[in-house]
From Swiss-Prot:
GO biological process, one term: adenine biosynthetic process
Organism: Geobacillus thermodenitrificans (strain NG80-2)
Family to which the UniProt record says this protein belongs: Belongs to the AIR synthase family.
Keyword NAD: no
Primary localisation category: cytoplasm
Top-level taxon of the source organism: Bacteria
Cellular localization per UniProt: Cytoplasm
Reactions listed under catalytic activity: 2-formamido-N(1)-(5-O-phospho-beta-D-ribosyl)acetamidine + ATP = 5-amino-1-(5-phospho-beta-D-ribosyl)imidazole + ADP + phosphate + H(+)
Pathway: Purine metabolism; IMP biosynthesis via de novo pathway; 5-amino-1-(5-phospho-D-ribosyl)imidazole from N(2)-formyl-N(1)-(5-phospho-D-ribosyl)glycinamide: step 2/2
UniProt-recorded name of the protein: Phosphoribosylformylglycinamidine cyclo-ligase
GO MF, one annotated term: ATP binding
The protein's Enzyme Commission number: 6.3.3.1
Keyword Electron transport belongs to the record: no
Name of the gene encoding the protein in the UniProt record: purM
């Protein structure tokens, strides 16, 4: 029967080998609360030792999107898992949660053990960076659904927060200040547009270094998404943060309003932070308008915090002392949506 299954395109032995190879990576993510190891029907996590009066579990799920296509083209698979963790974890930490555990899902056309292990290594590296345990996952070999050299990657994270310390945005008011934390690059959104610009419009090579970039284009595009979990935990332990927005799909235009109460908008100050060269490069090659850039990309800001005016300067100063750049990028105003003021167009 196993032989027949292999002839149908599913190699069970390859799956076993992949699990054996990934165990070393999974092990480094373990926390004391994890019960048992991988391989069970479900992952176990003991909450009893955590010191919360009114604990609230906060969950998130996401994938990497078409950034995967570039990993396929470059045959580089050891960092794409970091992106998967980041996309999930950043969504829950902006609500004040501490990530506890993570699960991944890999669907592929052909299970190549070394490739699967490389993907999981990235997931494990992301979990270590976020402080959460990788307690389970699924690798599904699906011939006929995916090409042999392609796969999809998704993840699921659960975190915890004290109910009274959830960051909900409800206390945000006009006059509050917006602080931006830098991104590492494109992060994990906008890649369908990126691929269209690079391959169809500009017909560029992933192996070439183009001005103003300082690394090959492919390397720039595969830079892992920044994970903000540990930094935000330190921030939340010292400062009152009224609201936070993870700048992902939809850019500034869609994501910043998600943290605002009804009747409020934001005014962004152009030129108040350094826009990374990759964004200027893509805008020029794709002939894109400012509004579209801010509707698709993070433009060099991966996370936005809303704080009271008296908190803004001390927070930026403290972050600077931690060698963590931060920028006052705008303010909350009466109205709705996102507007821009000052300087030249980004």
């Amino acid at each position: 029967m196993v032989k027949a299954y292999k002839q149908a395109g599913v190699d069970i032995e390859a799956g076993y080998q992949a699990v054996a190879l990934m165990k070393q990576h999974v092990q480094k993510t373990m926390r004391p609360e994890v019960l048992g190891g991988i391989g069970g029907f479900g992952g176990l996590f003991d909450l009893s030792s955590l010191d919360y009066r009114q604990p609230v579990l906060v969950s998130g799920t996401d994938g990497v999107g078409t950034k995967l296509k570039l990993a396929f083209l470059l045959d580089r698979h050891n960092t794409i898992g970091i992106d998967c963790v980041a996309m999930c974890v950043n969504d829950i930490v902006v609500q004040g949660a501490e990530p506890l555990f993570f699960l991944d899902y890999i669907a592929c056309g052909k299970a190549v053990p070394e490739k699967i292990a490389a993907i999981v290594k990235g997931v494990a590296d992301g979990c270590v960076e976020a402080g959460c345990a990788l307690i389970g996952g699924e690798t599904a070999e699906m011939p006929g659904m995916y090409a042999e050299d392609e796969y999809d990657l998704a993840g699921f994270v659960v975190g915890i927060a004290e109910k009274e310390r959830l960051v909900t945005g409800q206390t945000i008011q006009a006059g509050d200040v917006l602080i931006g934390l830098p991104s590492s690059g494109l992060h994990s959104n906008g890649y369908s547009l990126v691929r269209r610009i690079i391959f169809e419009q500009a017909k560029l090579s992933l192996d070439e270094i183009y001005e103003p970039l300082d690394v090959p284009l492919g390397e720039e595009l595969l830079k892992p998404t920044r994970i903000y979990a540990k930094l935000l935990r330190s921030v939340l332990g010292r400062f009152t943060i009224k609201g936070m927005a993870h700048i992902t799909g939809g850019g500034f235009i869609e994501n910043i309003p998600r943290m605002l109460p009804q009747g409020l908008g934001v005014r962004i100050q152009r030129g108040s932070w350094p826009v990374l060269p990759i964004f200027d490069f893509l805008r020029a090659k794709g002939n894109l308008e400012e509004e579209e850039m801010f509707s698709v990309f993070n433009m060099g800001i991966g996370l936005v915090l809303a704080v009271s005016p008296e908190t803004a300067a001390p927070l930026v100063q403290w972050l600077d002392e931690q060698n963590e750049p931060a920028y006052i990028i705008g303010e909350v105003v009466e109205g709705a949506g996102v507007s821009f003021t000052g300087g030249n167009e980004a």
